[in-house]
Amino acid sequence: MAMTKHRKRDKQTVWLGDAEFDAELLPALTYFKRAGIQTEFSCAGVSLLDEPENHSLYAYITFITSKKTESFIEYSMERMRHRLLVTYEPSRKRYDPSSFFIGHNRRFCTLMNQYAQGFYLSQC
């Protein structure tokens, strides 16, 4: 017998400029913008408890390659260690850091917000 999945809350999105983003990554995206780090896509993912029908298995942010981006990627890899998976697409010149463990979307967002702020403040 299949279990009925009940929605706990809708996915929350906000507008930043002319693009819509997951609300849980807004602090990080704001710090990246202030630091001059260009992002292209992001997904906070949501848990099965929040959105049983339309959830993402992992959270990610796509960064356009630059010196600042590379510095942040290195900074976050040193701190997040095994919690972070980073892929690089040479043909598109972009990095895709994501949550390494399925189901750890909120922790990824919390850490990304924390390290985006720390990186930004270290650059000031």
PLM feature spans:
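Structured alpha/beta or helical-core interaction and ligand-binding surfaces enriched in interleaved
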Residues: 1-124
